[in-house]
Design a protein with these regions (language model features):
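Alpha-helical scaffold/interaction cores of sigma-54-like transcription cofactors
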Residues: 1-461
Length: 461
Protein backbone atom coordinates (compact mmCIF):
# COMPACT_ATOMS: atom_id res chain seq x y z
CA UNK A 1 0.00 0.00 0.00
CA UNK A 2 2.82 2.41 0.87
CA UNK A 3 4.55 1.64 -2.43
CA UNK A 4 1.35 2.42 -4.32
CA UNK A 5 0.86 5.66 -2.37
CA UNK A 6 4.43 6.81 -3.09
CA UNK A 7 4.02 5.96 -6.78
CA UNK A 8 0.81 7.99 -6.98
CA UNK A 9 2.53 11.01 -5.41
CA UNK A 10 5.47 10.94 -7.84
CA UNK A 11 5.02 13.23 -10.83
CA UNK A 12 8.41 12.89 -12.51
CA UNK A 13 8.34 13.46 -16.25
CA UNK A 14 11.33 12.42 -18.33
CA UNK A 15 12.42 15.06 -20.82
CA UNK A 16 13.73 13.22 -23.84
CA UNK A 17 14.20 16.12 -26.25
CA UNK A 18 18.02 16.08 -25.98
CA UNK A 19 19.97 14.06 -28.53
CA UNK A 20 23.13 12.49 -27.13
CA UNK A 21 24.89 12.24 -30.49
CA UNK A 22 28.67 12.11 -30.24
CA UNK A 23 30.48 14.93 -31.98
CA UNK A 24 32.44 14.40 -35.18
CA UNK A 25 35.54 16.52 -35.79
CA UNK A 26 36.08 17.45 -39.43
CA UNK A 27 39.69 18.00 -40.59
CA UNK A 28 41.38 21.38 -40.93
CA UNK A 29 38.78 23.22 -38.89
CA UNK A 30 36.08 22.81 -41.56
CA UNK A 31 32.50 23.05 -40.32
CA UNK A 32 30.89 19.62 -40.21
CA UNK A 33 28.02 20.67 -42.48
CA UNK A 34 30.49 21.98 -45.09
CA UNK A 35 32.57 18.80 -44.83
CA UNK A 36 29.50 16.60 -45.34
CA UNK A 37 28.50 18.66 -48.37
CA UNK A 38 32.04 18.39 -49.79
CA UNK A 39 32.10 14.59 -49.39
CA UNK A 40 28.63 14.19 -50.86
CA UNK A 41 29.27 16.24 -53.99
CA UNK A 42 32.65 14.57 -54.57
CA UNK A 43 30.87 11.21 -54.47
CA UNK A 44 28.05 12.58 -56.63
CA UNK A 45 30.47 13.59 -59.39
CA UNK A 46 32.28 10.25 -59.20
CA UNK A 47 29.22 7.99 -59.11
CA UNK A 48 26.83 9.99 -61.28
CA UNK A 49 28.92 11.91 -63.84
CA UNK A 50 25.99 12.16 -66.27
CA UNK A 51 23.34 13.08 -63.71
CA UNK A 52 20.84 15.78 -64.61
CA UNK A 53 19.90 18.85 -62.58
CA UNK A 54 17.02 17.07 -60.80
CA UNK A 55 19.48 14.63 -59.22
CA UNK A 56 21.64 17.47 -57.89
CA UNK A 57 18.48 19.15 -56.58
CA UNK A 58 17.55 15.96 -54.74
CA UNK A 59 20.99 15.83 -53.11
CA UNK A 60 20.65 19.49 -52.09
CA UNK A 61 17.23 18.72 -50.62
CA UNK A 62 18.52 15.73 -48.67
CA UNK A 63 21.44 17.73 -47.28
CA UNK A 64 19.09 20.52 -46.15
CA UNK A 65 16.85 17.98 -44.36
CA UNK A 66 19.86 16.30 -42.74
CA UNK A 67 21.19 19.65 -41.52
CA UNK A 68 17.82 21.01 -40.35
CA UNK A 69 17.07 17.82 -38.41
CA UNK A 70 20.50 17.89 -36.74
CA UNK A 71 21.92 14.69 -38.22
CA UNK A 72 25.07 15.99 -39.94
CA UNK A 73 27.32 14.36 -37.35
CA UNK A 74 25.35 11.12 -37.61
CA UNK A 75 26.05 10.81 -41.34
CA UNK A 76 29.73 11.68 -40.83
CA UNK A 77 30.10 9.10 -38.03
CA UNK A 78 28.62 6.35 -40.22
CA UNK A 79 30.70 7.45 -43.22
CA UNK A 80 33.84 7.39 -41.08
CA UNK A 81 33.60 3.83 -39.77
CA UNK A 82 32.48 2.45 -43.14
CA UNK A 83 35.41 4.26 -44.76
CA UNK A 84 37.67 2.64 -42.15
CA UNK A 85 36.27 -0.79 -42.98
CA UNK A 86 36.69 -0.41 -46.73
CA UNK A 87 40.22 1.02 -46.42
CA UNK A 88 41.16 -2.02 -44.35
CA UNK A 89 39.74 -4.62 -46.71
CA UNK A 90 36.66 -5.44 -44.62
CA UNK A 91 33.77 -6.30 -46.93
CA UNK A 92 30.71 -4.11 -46.31
CA UNK A 93 27.21 -4.93 -47.54
CA UNK A 94 25.64 -2.73 -50.24
CA UNK A 95 22.97 -1.46 -47.87
CA UNK A 96 19.57 -2.64 -46.71
CA UNK A 97 16.45 -1.14 -45.21
CA UNK A 98 15.22 2.42 -45.59
CA UNK A 99 18.75 3.88 -45.55
CA UNK A 100 19.19 2.70 -49.15
CA UNK A 101 16.73 5.45 -50.14
CA UNK A 102 19.22 8.20 -49.35
CA UNK A 103 21.16 9.70 -52.25
CA UNK A 104 23.51 11.34 -49.73
CA UNK A 105 24.32 7.91 -48.28
CA UNK A 106 24.97 6.57 -51.79
CA UNK A 107 27.33 9.47 -52.57
CA UNK A 108 29.16 8.88 -49.26
CA UNK A 109 29.63 5.16 -50.09
CA UNK A 110 27.58 4.26 -47.01
CA UNK A 111 25.38 2.34 -49.45
CA UNK A 112 26.08 1.03 -52.94
CA UNK A 113 22.45 1.14 -54.10
CA UNK A 114 21.49 3.95 -56.50
CA UNK A 115 18.19 5.23 -55.03
CA UNK A 116 17.25 7.10 -58.21
CA UNK A 117 17.74 4.12 -60.50
CA UNK A 118 15.80 1.92 -58.08
CA UNK A 119 12.98 4.41 -57.31
CA UNK A 120 13.76 4.55 -53.58
CA UNK A 121 12.39 7.35 -51.44
CA UNK A 122 14.45 9.44 -49.02
CA UNK A 123 11.47 10.35 -46.81
CA UNK A 124 11.05 6.74 -45.80
CA UNK A 125 14.48 7.01 -44.15
CA UNK A 126 14.40 10.59 -42.87
CA UNK A 127 11.06 12.32 -42.68
CA UNK A 128 10.97 16.04 -41.78
CA UNK A 129 7.37 15.56 -40.56
CA UNK A 130 8.30 12.72 -38.19
CA UNK A 131 11.24 13.52 -35.92
CA UNK A 132 12.98 10.25 -35.14
CA UNK A 133 16.53 8.95 -35.17
CA UNK A 134 17.72 7.67 -38.55
CA UNK A 135 18.87 4.08 -38.63
CA UNK A 136 21.34 2.51 -41.05
CA UNK A 137 21.48 -1.30 -41.02
CA UNK A 138 25.03 -2.13 -42.07
CA UNK A 139 26.40 -5.59 -42.86
CA UNK A 140 30.05 -6.46 -42.32
CA UNK A 141 32.11 -9.57 -42.91
CA UNK A 142 31.20 -11.80 -39.97
CA UNK A 143 34.81 -12.54 -39.02
CA UNK A 144 35.91 -8.88 -39.05
CA UNK A 145 32.85 -7.08 -37.66
CA UNK A 146 34.54 -6.71 -34.26
CA UNK A 147 37.39 -4.72 -35.84
CA UNK A 148 34.90 -2.03 -36.85
CA UNK A 149 33.37 -1.95 -33.37
CA UNK A 150 36.87 -1.72 -31.85
CA UNK A 151 37.62 1.24 -34.15
CA UNK A 152 34.48 3.04 -32.94
CA UNK A 153 35.39 2.32 -29.29
CA UNK A 154 38.91 3.65 -29.85
CA UNK A 155 37.68 6.78 -31.65
CA UNK A 156 34.91 7.81 -29.23
CA UNK A 157 36.21 6.24 -26.01
CA UNK A 158 35.24 3.02 -24.27
CA UNK A 159 33.18 4.98 -21.72
CA UNK A 160 31.01 6.30 -24.57
CA UNK A 161 30.21 2.99 -26.29
CA UNK A 162 28.20 -0.01 -25.09
CA UNK A 163 26.37 -2.98 -26.50
CA UNK A 164 22.62 -3.23 -26.03
CA UNK A 165 20.55 -5.58 -23.91
CA UNK A 166 17.67 -7.51 -25.44
CA UNK A 167 14.93 -9.42 -23.70
CA UNK A 168 13.68 -12.77 -24.91
CA UNK A 169 9.96 -13.14 -24.28
CA UNK A 170 7.81 -16.18 -23.59
CA UNK A 171 6.27 -17.52 -26.77
CA UNK A 172 3.03 -19.50 -26.57
CA UNK A 173 4.54 -22.99 -26.42
CA UNK A 174 7.32 -21.96 -24.02
CA UNK A 175 4.80 -20.34 -21.67
CA UNK A 176 2.76 -23.56 -21.53
CA UNK A 177 5.85 -25.64 -20.75
CA UNK A 178 7.12 -23.24 -18.06
CA UNK A 179 3.74 -22.98 -16.34
CA UNK A 180 3.27 -26.75 -16.50
CA UNK A 181 6.64 -27.20 -14.81
CA UNK A 182 5.71 -24.69 -12.08
CA UNK A 183 2.39 -26.48 -11.49
CA UNK A 184 4.20 -29.85 -11.23
CA UNK A 185 2.12 -31.32 -14.03
CA UNK A 186 3.45 -34.46 -15.77
CA UNK A 187 5.88 -33.44 -18.52
CA UNK A 188 4.29 -35.75 -21.08
CA UNK A 189 0.85 -34.19 -20.58
CA UNK A 190 2.21 -30.63 -20.78
CA UNK A 191 4.30 -31.41 -23.86
CA UNK A 192 1.25 -32.87 -25.59
CA UNK A 193 -0.73 -29.66 -24.92
CA UNK A 194 2.19 -27.44 -26.03
CA UNK A 195 2.41 -29.30 -29.34
CA UNK A 196 -1.28 -28.57 -29.99
CA UNK A 197 -0.30 -24.89 -30.37
CA UNK A 198 0.35 -24.31 -34.12
CA UNK A 199 4.03 -23.65 -34.85
CA UNK A 200 3.46 -20.39 -36.72
CA UNK A 201 5.19 -17.01 -36.48
CA UNK A 202 3.68 -14.72 -33.80
CA UNK A 203 1.22 -17.40 -32.68
CA UNK A 204 -0.68 -16.56 -29.48
CA UNK A 205 -2.60 -18.88 -27.18
CA UNK A 206 -5.77 -16.86 -27.79
CA UNK A 207 -5.46 -17.46 -31.52
CA UNK A 208 -4.41 -21.08 -31.03
CA UNK A 209 -7.63 -21.77 -29.12
CA UNK A 210 -9.54 -20.39 -32.10
CA UNK A 211 -7.80 -22.27 -34.91
CA UNK A 212 -6.84 -25.54 -33.19
CA UNK A 213 -9.96 -27.68 -32.53
CA UNK A 214 -7.81 -30.19 -30.63
CA UNK A 215 -6.51 -27.54 -28.20
CA UNK A 216 -9.95 -25.97 -27.81
CA UNK A 217 -11.49 -29.35 -26.95
CA UNK A 218 -8.78 -30.08 -24.35
CA UNK A 219 -9.22 -26.59 -22.84
CA UNK A 220 -12.98 -27.03 -22.43
CA UNK A 221 -12.81 -30.65 -21.26
CA UNK A 222 -10.29 -30.47 -18.40
CA UNK A 223 -10.10 -28.01 -15.51
CA UNK A 224 -6.35 -28.73 -15.14
CA UNK A 225 -5.68 -27.89 -18.78
CA UNK A 226 -7.88 -24.80 -18.54
CA UNK A 227 -5.85 -23.63 -15.53
CA UNK A 228 -2.61 -24.38 -17.42
CA UNK A 229 -3.68 -22.36 -20.47
CA UNK A 230 -5.16 -19.47 -18.46
CA UNK A 231 -1.96 -19.01 -16.43
CA UNK A 232 0.11 -19.36 -19.61
CA UNK A 233 -1.91 -16.62 -21.33
CA UNK A 234 -1.02 -14.24 -18.48
CA UNK A 235 2.71 -14.98 -18.84
CA UNK A 236 2.79 -15.10 -22.63
CA UNK A 237 4.86 -12.24 -24.07
CA UNK A 238 6.53 -11.44 -20.74
CA UNK A 239 10.35 -11.18 -20.59
CA UNK A 240 11.93 -14.58 -20.01
CA UNK A 241 15.65 -13.87 -20.16
CA UNK A 242 18.14 -11.14 -21.02
CA UNK A 243 20.94 -11.36 -23.55
CA UNK A 244 23.15 -9.09 -25.65
CA UNK A 245 21.70 -7.78 -28.91
CA UNK A 246 23.46 -9.50 -31.80
CA UNK A 247 24.23 -6.29 -33.69
CA UNK A 248 23.22 -3.21 -31.69
CA UNK A 249 25.83 -0.78 -30.38
CA UNK A 250 25.05 2.56 -28.73
CA UNK A 251 27.40 5.57 -28.95
CA UNK A 252 26.93 8.57 -26.63
CA UNK A 253 28.26 12.12 -26.49
CA UNK A 254 28.50 11.86 -22.69
CA UNK A 255 30.00 8.95 -20.73
CA UNK A 256 27.29 6.38 -21.19
CA UNK A 257 27.04 5.55 -17.49
CA UNK A 258 25.78 9.11 -16.94
CA UNK A 259 22.90 8.56 -19.35
CA UNK A 260 21.68 4.97 -18.84
CA UNK A 261 22.29 2.15 -16.34
CA UNK A 262 24.80 -0.49 -17.42
CA UNK A 263 25.53 -4.09 -16.56
CA UNK A 264 28.20 -6.70 -17.29
CA UNK A 265 27.00 -9.43 -19.61
CA UNK A 266 29.71 -12.07 -19.98
CA UNK A 267 32.74 -10.03 -21.09
CA UNK A 268 30.87 -7.08 -22.59
CA UNK A 269 29.24 -4.04 -21.03
CA UNK A 270 25.60 -3.65 -22.04
CA UNK A 271 22.88 -1.12 -21.36
CA UNK A 272 20.07 -2.17 -19.03
CA UNK A 273 17.57 -0.45 -21.33
CA UNK A 274 16.53 -2.13 -24.60
CA UNK A 275 16.86 -0.56 -28.02
CA UNK A 276 13.48 1.20 -28.15
CA UNK A 277 14.05 2.98 -24.83
CA UNK A 278 17.54 4.09 -25.87
CA UNK A 279 16.13 5.70 -29.02
CA UNK A 280 13.47 7.50 -26.94
CA UNK A 281 16.28 8.89 -24.77
CA UNK A 282 17.99 10.34 -27.84
CA UNK A 283 20.93 7.95 -27.94
CA UNK A 284 22.61 6.95 -31.18
CA UNK A 285 22.06 3.27 -31.91
CA UNK A 286 23.99 1.52 -34.67
CA UNK A 287 23.48 -1.97 -36.06
CA UNK A 288 26.83 -3.62 -36.84
CA UNK A 289 25.50 -6.77 -38.50
CA UNK A 290 27.91 -9.66 -38.98
CA UNK A 291 26.88 -11.48 -42.16
CA UNK A 292 28.45 -14.86 -42.91
CA UNK A 293 27.47 -14.51 -46.57
CA UNK A 294 29.91 -11.59 -46.89
CA UNK A 295 32.62 -13.77 -45.35
CA UNK A 296 31.91 -16.47 -47.95
CA UNK A 297 32.11 -13.85 -50.72
CA UNK A 298 35.44 -12.62 -49.33
CA UNK A 299 36.82 -16.17 -49.22
CA UNK A 300 35.59 -16.81 -52.78
CA UNK A 301 37.28 -13.67 -54.10
CA UNK A 302 40.50 -14.64 -52.29
CA UNK A 303 40.33 -18.11 -53.83
CA UNK A 304 39.85 -16.66 -57.33
CA UNK A 305 42.87 -14.39 -56.80
CA UNK A 306 45.06 -17.25 -55.54
CA UNK A 307 44.06 -19.26 -58.61
CA UNK A 308 45.67 -16.63 -60.83
CA UNK A 309 42.39 -15.43 -62.31
CA UNK A 310 41.07 -11.89 -62.51
CA UNK A 311 39.11 -11.04 -59.37
CA UNK A 312 35.71 -9.53 -60.22
CA UNK A 313 34.94 -6.10 -58.79
CA UNK A 314 31.69 -6.25 -56.87
CA UNK A 315 30.81 -2.59 -57.41
CA UNK A 316 30.99 -2.84 -61.22
CA UNK A 317 29.43 -6.27 -61.76
CA UNK A 318 26.50 -6.57 -64.16
CA UNK A 319 23.37 -8.45 -63.14
CA UNK A 320 22.35 -9.86 -66.51
CA UNK A 321 23.95 -13.32 -66.78
CA UNK A 322 21.24 -15.67 -68.20
CA UNK A 323 22.98 -18.73 -66.73
CA UNK A 324 22.62 -17.30 -63.23
CA UNK A 325 18.90 -16.68 -63.74
CA UNK A 326 18.47 -20.19 -65.17
CA UNK A 327 20.15 -21.61 -62.04
CA UNK A 328 17.88 -19.57 -59.76
CA UNK A 329 14.79 -20.58 -61.76
CA UNK A 330 15.69 -24.23 -61.16
CA UNK A 331 15.66 -23.55 -57.42
CA UNK A 332 19.39 -24.29 -57.28
CA UNK A 333 20.01 -21.68 -54.57
CA UNK A 334 21.52 -23.54 -51.60
CA UNK A 335 23.67 -21.04 -49.70
CA UNK A 336 22.35 -18.02 -51.63
CA UNK A 337 21.43 -15.26 -49.19
CA UNK A 338 17.64 -14.96 -48.75
CA UNK A 339 16.95 -17.48 -51.55
CA UNK A 340 17.88 -20.74 -49.84
CA UNK A 341 14.79 -21.83 -47.85
CA UNK A 342 12.69 -24.69 -49.21
CA UNK A 343 9.63 -22.45 -49.60
CA UNK A 344 11.60 -19.75 -51.41
CA UNK A 345 13.17 -22.29 -53.80
CA UNK A 346 9.71 -23.62 -54.65
CA UNK A 347 8.48 -20.08 -55.28
CA UNK A 348 11.47 -19.26 -57.52
CA UNK A 349 10.71 -22.29 -59.70
CA UNK A 350 7.20 -20.87 -60.23
CA UNK A 351 8.40 -17.29 -60.71
CA UNK A 352 11.23 -18.09 -63.17
CA UNK A 353 13.06 -14.77 -62.64
CA UNK A 354 14.97 -13.42 -65.63
CA UNK A 355 15.98 -10.03 -64.23
CA UNK A 356 17.40 -8.62 -61.02
CA UNK A 357 14.11 -6.76 -60.49
CA UNK A 358 12.29 -10.13 -60.42
CA UNK A 359 14.56 -11.36 -57.63
CA UNK A 360 14.03 -8.18 -55.58
CA UNK A 361 10.27 -8.50 -56.05
CA UNK A 362 10.40 -12.21 -55.17
CA UNK A 363 12.14 -11.55 -51.86
CA UNK A 364 9.64 -8.80 -51.06
CA UNK A 365 6.64 -10.98 -51.96
CA UNK A 366 7.76 -13.99 -49.94
CA UNK A 367 6.64 -12.72 -46.55
CA UNK A 368 3.36 -12.44 -44.62
CA UNK A 369 0.97 -9.99 -46.26
CA UNK A 370 2.43 -9.65 -49.77
CA UNK A 371 2.28 -13.46 -50.16
CA UNK A 372 -1.37 -13.08 -51.15
CA UNK A 373 -0.15 -11.35 -54.34
CA UNK A 374 2.12 -14.22 -55.42
CA UNK A 375 -0.36 -16.12 -57.68
CA UNK A 376 -1.34 -12.94 -59.53
CA UNK A 377 2.26 -11.76 -59.84
CA UNK A 378 3.51 -15.12 -61.17
CA UNK A 379 0.63 -15.41 -63.66
CA UNK A 380 1.13 -11.87 -64.97
CA UNK A 381 4.91 -12.19 -65.09
CA UNK A 382 4.74 -15.41 -67.10
CA UNK A 383 2.05 -14.10 -69.47
CA UNK A 384 -0.79 -16.27 -68.18
CA UNK A 385 -3.05 -13.30 -67.39
CA UNK A 386 -3.10 -9.66 -68.54
CA UNK A 387 -1.69 -6.86 -66.40
CA UNK A 388 -4.46 -4.45 -65.42
CA UNK A 389 -4.58 -1.19 -63.47
CA UNK A 390 -7.49 0.42 -61.61
CA UNK A 391 -6.39 3.81 -62.97
CA UNK A 392 -3.91 5.00 -65.58
CA UNK A 393 -1.91 6.88 -62.92
CA UNK A 394 -1.06 3.52 -61.33
CA UNK A 395 0.70 2.23 -64.45
CA UNK A 396 4.07 4.00 -63.99
CA UNK A 397 4.07 3.03 -60.29
CA UNK A 398 3.10 -0.64 -60.69
CA UNK A 399 4.42 -1.42 -64.19
CA UNK A 400 7.61 -3.15 -62.97
CA UNK A 401 5.62 -5.37 -60.60
CA UNK A 402 2.93 -6.39 -63.10
CA UNK A 403 0.16 -4.36 -61.48
CA UNK A 404 0.78 -5.70 -57.96
CA UNK A 405 1.63 -3.54 -54.94
CA UNK A 406 4.82 -5.17 -53.65
CA UNK A 407 6.88 -2.41 -52.02
CA UNK A 408 6.14 0.15 -49.32
CA UNK A 409 7.60 2.79 -51.64
CA UNK A 410 4.76 2.03 -54.06
CA UNK A 411 2.23 2.76 -51.31
CA UNK A 412 3.93 6.13 -50.77
CA UNK A 413 3.91 6.91 -54.49
CA UNK A 414 0.22 5.97 -54.82
CA UNK A 415 -0.98 8.24 -52.02
CA UNK A 416 1.23 11.02 -53.41
CA UNK A 417 0.22 10.75 -57.08
CA UNK A 418 -3.44 9.85 -56.60
CA UNK A 419 -4.20 11.48 -53.26
CA UNK A 420 -2.07 14.63 -53.52
CA UNK A 421 0.02 13.85 -50.42
CA UNK A 422 3.57 15.08 -49.93
CA UNK A 423 6.20 12.34 -49.75
CA UNK A 424 6.78 13.18 -46.09
CA UNK A 425 3.09 12.78 -45.31
CA UNK A 426 2.84 9.64 -47.45
CA UNK A 427 5.52 8.11 -45.23
CA UNK A 428 3.27 8.64 -42.23
CA UNK A 429 0.58 6.61 -44.04
CA UNK A 430 3.12 3.89 -44.85
CA UNK A 431 4.22 3.78 -41.24
CA UNK A 432 0.63 3.59 -39.93
CA UNK A 433 -0.08 0.78 -42.38
CA UNK A 434 3.00 -1.24 -41.37
CA UNK A 435 2.24 -0.72 -37.66
CA UNK A 436 -1.44 -1.66 -38.21
CA UNK A 437 -2.72 1.59 -36.71
CA UNK A 438 -6.36 1.15 -37.70
CA UNK A 439 -7.61 4.51 -36.38
CA UNK A 440 -4.97 6.40 -38.33
CA UNK A 441 -5.71 4.38 -41.47
CA UNK A 442 -9.46 5.02 -41.19
CA UNK A 443 -8.78 8.77 -41.03
CA UNK A 444 -6.29 8.65 -43.90
CA UNK A 445 -8.72 6.61 -46.01
CA UNK A 446 -11.13 9.55 -46.02
CA UNK A 447 -8.29 12.01 -46.69
CA UNK A 448 -7.11 9.83 -49.59
CA UNK A 449 -10.61 9.67 -51.13
CA UNK A 450 -10.94 13.46 -50.86
CA UNK A 451 -7.48 13.82 -52.40
CA UNK A 452 -8.54 11.50 -55.26
CA UNK A 453 -11.49 13.74 -56.01
CA UNK A 454 -9.33 16.87 -55.97
CA UNK A 455 -7.00 15.14 -58.46
CA UNK A 456 -10.00 14.32 -60.68
CA UNK A 457 -10.03 10.63 -59.76
CA UNK A 458 -13.26 8.91 -58.61
CA UNK A 459 -13.22 8.34 -54.84
CA UNK A 460 -14.22 4.69 -55.22
CA UNK A 461 -10.74 3.88 -56.51
Amino acid sequence: DNTQEIAEKCQLEFKNEEKHLPGFTAPNGIKNSAYLRKLCFEGFKEKMPNADASNAERLEYELSVIENMGFVDYFLIVWDFIDFAKRNGIIVGPGRGSGAGSLAAYCLNITDVDPIKNDLIFERFLNPERISMPDFDIDFCYERRQEVIDYVVQKYGENHVAQIITFGTMAARAAVRDVGRALHMPYGDVDKIAKMVPAELNMTLERALTISPELNLAYNSSSNIKTLIDFSKRLEGQPRHASTHAAGVVISKHPIMEVVPLQKNDESVTTQFPMGTLEELGLLKMDFLGLRTLTVIRDTLDFIGRSGKEVPKLDTMEYNDPEVYAMISRGDTDGVFQLESAGMRQFLMQLKPDSFEDIIAGISLFRPGPMAQIPRYVSAKNGMEPVTYLHEKLQPILKNTYGCIVYQEQVMQIVRDLGGYSLARSDLVRRAMSKKKHEVMAKERQNFIEGNEEEGIPGAI
